[in-house]
UniProtKB/Swiss-Prot annotation:
Glycerol binds at R82, E83, Y134, D244, Q245. ATP binds at T12, T13, S14, T266, G309, Q313, G410. Keywords: ATP-binding, Glycerol metabolism, Kinase, Nucleotide-binding, Phosphoprotein, Transferase. Belongs to the FGGY kinase family. The gene is glpK. This is Glycerol kinase. It comes from Bacillus licheniformis (strain ATCC 14580 / DSM 13 / JCM 2505 / CCUG 7422 / NBRC 12200 / NCIMB 9375 / NCTC 10341 / NRRL NRS-1264 / Gibson 46). The keyword Metal-binding does not apply. Activated by phosphorylation and inhibited by fructose 1,6-bisphosphate (FBP). One of its GO terms (molecular function) is ATP binding. ADP binds at T12, R16, T266, G309, G410, N414.
Amino acid sequence: MEKYILSLDQGTTSTRAIVFNKAGEIVHIAQKEFRQYFPNPGWVEHNANEIWGSVLSVIASALSESGIEAGQIAGIGITNQRETTVVWDKHTGKPVYNAIVWQSRQSAEICQELKEKGYEETIREKTGLLIDPYFSGTKVKWILDHVEGAREKAENGDLLFGTIDSWLIWKMSGGKAHVTDYSNASRTLMFNIYDLKWDDELLDILGVPKSMLPEVKPSSHVYAETVDYHFFGKNIPIAGAAGDQQAALFGQACFEEGMVKNTYGTGCFMLMNTGEKAIKSEHGLLTTIAWGIDGKVEYALEGSVFVAGSAIQWLRDGLRMFKDAKESEKYAVRAESADGVYVVPAFVGLGTPYWDSDVRGAVFGLTRGTTKEHFIRATLEALAYQTKDVLDAMKEDSGIPVKTLRVDGGAVKNNFLMDFQGDILDVPVERPEINETTALGSAYLAGLAVGFWSDRSEIKDQWQLDKRFEPKMEEKERESLYNGWKKAVNAARAFK
């Protein structure tokens, strides 16, 4: 009987179960969206039990629709929206509050207090991260400070904390395993990425009892088995876990030092594998753990662009320039250039390397001759310019020359964007045959742990190229265009 790996891709707006075969090919995808809660401006929450319900639903759909029996699943891998925080009662299994999502800014005041107390350097030195509401630690503190009775329960050892991977493993194992992996732990603001353990000083700063925290395990590891009543009477190994961006790096087979992937989703997330050394950034990048596997931990540099695919959605829904996001390519290629127009899509501030939350979106270079085509092209070009900002920072910090950029995510189907990306970077861009690299990464991690795949070299051989975009632009034109972008960003930042 043929065996498969099931990957659970628990994202910000939907949960998906993707079944992969031994060749790393997709056999079936099941997806279910769930509700977003916005209780106050800037707050984003999920119901953790609704997420759990969506997981059970997609597992059932994936197996029934594909005709695969539960006993044919050799292992389960989990990849998840990172930083999103769940706190639950360890006796009842009931969350004490909604899951606070990575995007949510409700712990901004806590972050401000930590900065005012001078903790920035300590936190940066130990975690590789910035003090920002984005990360889990201040979200946990917010729950303990604002939910009645929560702090007392936590001090008594009755509450558990977890990122989404921890919550799902706990639920799937029937409460037997309270664990996380190195990649998810490294996003909490509480984990020392050098000592590889929860840091007592950081826990003290945040006021989080150690008893709440999950045990940290490798990213490729059998954590527990599913309880039979959650998996059609079968005990299946839960064998891999990684945060979504780290899973994508693994799914792209970026196993060697200096290999880089960029995911074009709502925003862009670029990660560079830096091997067994954690590089401290001088250019606004985060230092993070890529994964723990084969008895060692490997690190990555990470850069975040806040607005990428959402800029294309803005053209479609806000400005009504087209009805389908795919049409953006058709309009962009009609214009020979952006004709001096620059769009700075800083709708929620700018991420790496600027970290400027006060700047807002701006458009420069408009003339009477500017057309819809110019505007659409300029918006797409902005995604490529922002990616160059991040890659340049990575090259500066690492001292590693980048030979190629591997790409994934929804926007990579846009050939114009990928072409321009290669041109402006002066680096070839490689688009893989399988675009579901996040789910594939967690499947690989689980498959390695249960012996479904033998080693990373077998996985590396499975990576297949769909298209390679070679840079063709002259150096002079590249410099001129990018200088214009930098001027536009500076002007937008001056307008506050």
